[in-house]
Structures are given as C-alpha cells and as structure tokens.
C-alpha cells in the first residue's frame, strides 16, 4: 500500500511539473509572439526602364536606381505572418537615353528633342523621390529564423522633389534642373517575392514622368518608369 501511494505521489509530481513547464513555454511564446515583426528596413537596387516612349526615343547604357527606407510591419493574424506595411523611403533613379531637354532662350518653355542622329557622350537625367510604400505582406516566417519565403504586393506614393538632366557633347555641356512639365506626384504598383536574402522586386509607374504639356513634335513625351531588381530586408 505504501509503495502504491509513493508511486502515485511521484506520478502526480511529474505531471504537475510537466504542466508548469508547458504553461511557462506557452506564456513565453505569447510574449514573444506579441512583439514579433519582420522586414522593417529595406535596401534595393534596380535596373530602370522607360516605357511608353515617343517615336525616336530609346535608352542607352545602364540606367539604375537605389532605394532605402523603413516600413512599419503590422501583423493582422495570430501567427503574425500576414501583415500590412506602411512606411517612408527615398529613391534615387538615373536614366540614360537620347531625349534632349533644354530651355528655350529667354523663356521658361522646355524644349524636347530626339538625339537619334546626334553624336554625344552623355545624356541622362536623375530623379530624387521621397516615397510612402503601402504593402500587403505574406511570409512563412517564425521568430527563430530569418530564412523564409515572402510575397509582398502593394503600391507606392511619392513626390519627385529634385530633377536634373545632363547633356554633354564635344562642344558643349547643358544642365537643367527646373522643368515645369514634370509630373512630380508619383504613384506605382509594386511586387516583391523571394527567400531569405534574395528578393526580386518589380515596380511599374501608373503616372508618366511628364505632363501632357511636354511635347516631342506633336507627340507627348510621357515616359512611364518601370524597375526590376533586388530588395534586401533588415530586422
């Protein structure tokens, strides 16, 4: 009888001890889960394209972009692998092409011409944009590892706060920074997917770079940027 009582007491002690450990683990998981976020800082590099080009306009050389920012990750499910992201960032973009941009002498009117048959060494423009990305985020992440699949889709709103064009040929160099025909309000859709460190990123602008007042002959200049590249996330 005594042996039976001792055996039952030992079993109960082990059971209670196991239950306390499980409760402690569950409690720690809840605390960790309530704080878990992912992919809040980003750095991206892209190859830049100009779509919807007027006749006679083409890109030449390499056109690239650098993008950095912070996105606040706001999970919307218990596993915290589905989230909404809202943030702020900066985007630098350089485009090499044969669209000549200058000012009509004595006026503020902008001249747009094709350099299709002109010998030049440099012709490009750069844009500096402050952006607000909005994303719907899905991932296979857990707090213990940074290696997981992700699919993020959304859009970016932006403001083009600085523009400069640079033309150089053997005889002259022309720079322009004030272009009235710029469409400074930017909006585009985004799609990012990948695993671990390497994530492919796509961007397509819903608004042209130039307003309808920018003309090349009788055709609007337009130009819709598209970007293809890699995005790297931190924290």
Model-assigned labels for residue ranges:
Residues 177-235:
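Predominantly the C-terminal beta-signal and adjacent terminal strand-loop region
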Residues 20-73, 231-235:
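Short glycine/proline- and aromatic-enriched beta-strand/turn motifs that initiate or cap beta-hairpins
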Residues 54-61, 96-105, 111-127, 160-188:
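Extracellular/periplasm-exposed beta-strand and loop segments of Gram-negative cell-envelope proteins
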């Amino acid at each position: 009888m005594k042996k039976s009582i001792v055996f039952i007491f030992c079993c109960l002690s082990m059971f209670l001890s196991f239950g306390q450990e499980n409760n402690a683990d569950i409690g720690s998981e809840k605390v960790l889960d309530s704080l878990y976020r992912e992919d809040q800082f980003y750095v991206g590099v892209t190859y830049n394209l100009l779509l919807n080009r007027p006749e006679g306009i083409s890109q030449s050389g390499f056109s690239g972009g650098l993008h950095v920012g912070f996105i606040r990750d706001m999970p919307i499910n218990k596993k915290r692998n589905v989230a909404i992201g809202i943030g702020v960032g900066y985007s630098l973009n350089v485009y090499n092409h044969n669209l000549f941009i200058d000012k009509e002498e004595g006026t503020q009117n902008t001249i747009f011409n094709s350099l299709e048959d002109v010998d030049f060494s440099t012709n490009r423009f750069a844009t500096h944009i402050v952006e607000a990305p909005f994303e719907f985020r899905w991932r296979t992440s857990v707090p213990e590892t940074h290696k997981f699949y992700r699919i993020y889709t959304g859009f970016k709103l932006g403001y083009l706060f600085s523009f400069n064009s640079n033309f150089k040929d053997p005889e002259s160099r022309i720079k322009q920074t004030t272009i009235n025909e710029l469409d400074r309000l930017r909006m585009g859709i985004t799609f990012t997917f990948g695993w671990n460190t390497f994530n492919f990123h796509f961007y397509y602008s819903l608004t042209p770079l130039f307003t309808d007042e920018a003309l090349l002959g009788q055709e609007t200049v337009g130009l819709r940027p598209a970007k293809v590249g890699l995005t790297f996330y931190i924290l």
